[in-house]
Design a protein with these regions (language model features):
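Active-site-proximal substrate-binding groove within the catalytic cores of carbohydrate-active enzymes
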Residues: 2, 6-9, 13-165
Length: 165
């Protein structure tokens, strides 16, 4: 990607945050995100339409992605017997409260990193990652079903993220 051609108002939506799942790859390294973070806004899949909302949220926190949701006004039952069943989770009234809770926390804790360069990414353990931003902010993401502790003493609850400023 040529950053000279990218405007700051550009947003890349529905980015595959997980990348390849080849069995010969031990760890995923976010080369793409390291290169563009702070220059271009990007999101993963819409949280309410993905097969695993929690994984997509954790991937977004690890890779510095914004959050995306796709909603419709009508009930999801309107989609039965149509070709649009992939939007079955787009019922706004069903997601409103959870969406506000997820978005508010994410924006309050990570909003200050959106225009910063991502300067580092490391695996603390096989299930605990740390993404580092130019102001020194660290974002720990725990994919484990157990609470984990980072080398600096930061405790990260199971299947959650912690931002250290």
């Amino acid at each position: 990607i040529s950053l000279g051609l990218v405007g700051s108002e550009m947003c890349i939506r529905d980015r595959d945050l997980e990348g390849t799942e080849y069995s010969i790859i031990d760890k995923k390294i976010p080369f793409y995100q390291l290169a563009i973070h702070g220059y271009v806004n990007y999101t993963g899949e819409a949280l309410n339409l993905t097969q695993n909302t929690q994984n997509e949220l954790l991937n977004s926190a690890e890779y510095g992605a914004g959050l995306a949701f796709t909603f419709m006004k009508e009930s999801a039952f309107e989609l039965q017997n149509t070709l649009y069943t992939e939007y079955f989770g787009a019922d706004y009234s069903a997601w409103h409260d959870e969406m506000l809770e997820i978005y508010t926390r994410y924006n309050e804790e990570l909003g200050h990193t959106f225009n910063q360069k991502m300067v580092g990414h490391e695996y603390v353990t096989s299930e605990l990652t740390c993404t580092i931003y130019e102001d020194g902010t660290k974002v720990y993401v725990n994919y484990s079903y157990d609470e984990l502790q980072a080398d600096d003493g930061t405790v990260v609850p199971a299947r959650d993220y912690v931002v250290v400023r």
